[in-house]
Curated annotation (Swiss-Prot):
Organism: Campylobacter curvus (strain 525.92)
PANTHER family: ELONGATION FACTOR TU, MITOCHONDRIAL, ELONGATION FACTOR TU-RELATED
A Pfam family this chain is assigned to: GTP_EFTU_D2
Upper lineage: Bacteria, Pseudomonadati, Campylobacterota, Epsilonproteobacteria, Campylobacterales
Enzyme Commission number(s): 3.6.5.3
Cellular compartments per GO CC: cytosol
Catalytic activity annotation: GTP + H2O = GDP + phosphate + H(+)
Ranges for region G1: 19-26
Functional note: GTP hydrolase that promotes the GTP-dependent binding of aminoacyl-tRNA to the A-site of ribosomes during protein biosynthesis.
Full protein name: Elongation factor Tu
Molecular function terms from GO: GTP binding; GTPase activity; translation elongation factor activity
Keywords associated with the record: Cytoplasm, Elongation factor, GTP-binding, Hydrolase, Magnesium, Metal-binding, Nucleotide-binding, Protein biosynthesis
Length: 399
């Protein structure tokens, strides 16, 4: 079994397949696992196995996603593939599958199609930083000029959405033929194309910065006063590291405050430092309990700033998902749940959009009634009377 060999001593990268329906995303996913399994770097996963993706609930939204893992000589990969277009939209917006990079699958026989464009735009909006292209079904195209034409079209499309189209690696091949070869136990020309694709993914998509190496950020969940010691705030560290003696800022809701960390505790034990993923209590010097509240964040000074206006890419839940039963219109005022708290905000719809129906995916402008620590890529939920009616990601800070 290949399973025994899986080790964590290689850098870990999250990727996924994106692209138009029926262009071969799932077949490529199966082909990658099959070709790499011949080298003992993966377990072979069947097409049907990947296609019958289990439904998962992410923030109340039902998403069908397949997760597979495999290795190359250089890295360990977690790979997501979604059966339906709506699943991709939900996945990318909720951040259920954070991708460090994506493999865009385009059929050489059809060229870029509407969802090809939509997935590239979504990647730009939700912050998928790198795209590598696999031109699939190349076995069905005899004309080399036609392949070149499709490649040019793909590069133009990437450029249009501010991806470096001219420098993006594009590999042409056939996922189906590679899968057939691997199943027959043959290392043929089509399998070689899949290996070439994975080499490009290894080279072109950088290893992500580990959460502990990023700037410190901790959303505040609760505030306590400990007599004789001062104020303690608790929460789960989102990124970075915090040490006793660090100068930090408290950002959001009220004007930004600067203070010093005088203690870090986990499970009532004193620690030298807390790091990404830890649930900790942080003791703050000279900070009054009434100056701090849930919804603010502790952070490294100047690393994140409070904002009230932003553009976001959102998915609005269907009635079946527990969302609204009716559309909403311009100036709709729900609550925006960011990290640990709700803040009311008003929504401005894009020009020409009269209303938004449950199940829609739309770009909105939001103005909050109180400032919140925000940056591009911050996720939020849209709530109404305590229930989630939408999910979104900040695509641009406006003010």
């Amino acid at each position: 079994m290949a399973k025994e060999k899986f080790s964590r001593n290689k850098p870990h990268v999250n990727i996924g397949t994106i692209g138009h329906v029926d262009h071969g995303k799932t077949t490529l996913t199966a082909a990658i696992s099959a070709v790499l399994s011949r080298k003992g770097l993966a377990e072979m996963k069947d097409y049907d196995n990947i296609d019958n993706a289990p439904e998962e609930k992410e923030r109340g939204i039902t998403i069908a996603t397949s997760h597979i893992e495999y290795e190359t000589e250089k890295r360990h990969y977690a790979h997501v593939d979604c059966p339906g277009h709506a699943d991709y939209v939900k996945n990318m917006i909720t951040g259920a599958a954070q991708m460090d990079g994506a493999i865009l699958v385009v059929s050489a026989a059809d060229g870029p199609m509407p969802q090809t464009r939509e997935h590239i735009l979504l990647s730009r909006q939700v912050g998928v930083p790198y795209i590598v292209v696999f031109m699939n079904k190349a076995d069905m195209v005899d004309d080399a000029e036609l392949l070149e034409l499709v490649e040019m079209e793909i590069r133009e499309l990437l450029n249009e959405y501010n991806f470096p189209g001219d420098d993006t690696p594009i590999i042409s091949g056939s996922a189906l033929k590679a899968l057939e070869e691997a199943k027959a136990g043959v290392d043929g020309e089509w399998s070689a194309k899949v290996l070439e694709l994975m080499d490009k993914v290894d080279e072109y998509i950088p290893t992500p910065v580990r959460a502990t190496d990023k700037d410190f950020l901790m959303p505040i969940e609760d505030v306590f006063s400990i007599s004789g010691r001062g104020t303690v705030v608790t929460g789960r560290i989102e990124k970075g590291v915090v040490k006793v003696g660090d100068t930090i800022e408290i950002v959001g809701i009220k004007p930004t405050q600067t203070t010093t960390v005088t203690g870090v505790e986990m499970f009532r034990k004193e620690m030298e430092q807390g790091e990404a993923g830890d649930n900790v209590g942080v003791l703050l010097r000279g900070t009054k309990k009434e100056d701090v509240e849930r919804g603010m964040v502790l952070c490294k000074p100047k690393s994140i700033t409070p904002h009230t206006k932003f553009e976001g890419e959102v998915y609005i839940l269907t009635k079946e998902e527990g969302g609204r039963h009716t559309p909403f219109f311009n100036n709709y005022r729900p609550q925006f749940y960011v990290r640990t708290t709700d803040v009311t905000g008003s929504i401005t719809l894009p020009e020409g959009t009269e209303m938004v129906m449950p199940g829609d995916n739309v770009r909105i402008s939001v103005e909050l009634i109180a400032p919140v620590a925000l940056e591009e890529g911050t996720r939020f939920a849209i709530r109404e009377g305590g229930r989630t009616v939408g999910s979104g990601v900040v695509s641009k800070i406006l003010a």
